[in-house]
Amino acid sequence: MKAKRLFVVAALICATSANAQNVKETFDSNSLDWNECATEGHGGKSIIDKGVLTITSEGANKFWSAMAGTQIGENTCFTCSCYAPLNVQRPFKISTNVTIGKLDNDRLVGLLFNYKDDGNFYAFIFNDEEVNFIRFKDMKFVGSKSQSVKWSKTRKAQQNWRLESDGSTLSFFVDELPIMKVRYMPLEYAGFGYYTFGKQKLIVDDVEFVQ
């Protein structure tokens, strides 16, 4: 009887392992077919080379800003996205190692997710003082949540970001520091990527999808 119980336990462990999914993108190639998008009138680029993804957004130039009546860098964003190998209806984790540039009110970085297309997505974005959860639907800004950030130590340029979903709560971590949680925001799409705002440079070493 004891041997039979051990066999059942071992079978359950194997079944659990078989159901788990772990995919790591190391940017040795464009295996997940990453795509880029910039706000109209603003430039940027994303390049996969030498095992990293480098995303550069140019922000707004002085001439365009003057014509639009905005501050330099205002209302500019650049994204790079793929379709993650995940079922977003189930719990998952996404972990990524990045190097970020200078942050300011008009220089932000973050994670893009629940991405359907350029006008329908969620994002966690932050600077040195504040983190925001933003939502776009049909090219319109439809909601946000903001809160201040208190870094436990001096913020590093090299960081680990982690996005977790348990089915009802979305949690965003920077270097194990939980900087924002939101609840009851249903996920429909597996699109995932990176969000830069203003004049910014983001280098991505790798990203791991766990389910």
Predicted regions and their residues:
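Sec-dependent N-terminal signal peptides
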Residues: 5-14
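Extracellular carbohydrate-recognition regions
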Residues: 20-41
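Extracellular beta-strand elements of beta-rich domains used
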Residues: 27, 205-209
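Short tryptophan-centered beta-strand motifs in secreted/extracellular beta-sheet-rich domains
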Residues: 27, 94-96, 154-166, 170-172
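Secretory/extracellular carbohydrate-interaction modules
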Residues: 59-136
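Short, aromatic/His-centered strand-loop micro-motif at the edge of beta-sheets
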Residues: 138-160
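Short strand-turn-strand beta-turns centered on an Asx-Gly dipeptide
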Residues: 173-177
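Flexible glycan-contacting loops in extracellular carbohydrate-active proteins
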Residues: 182-205
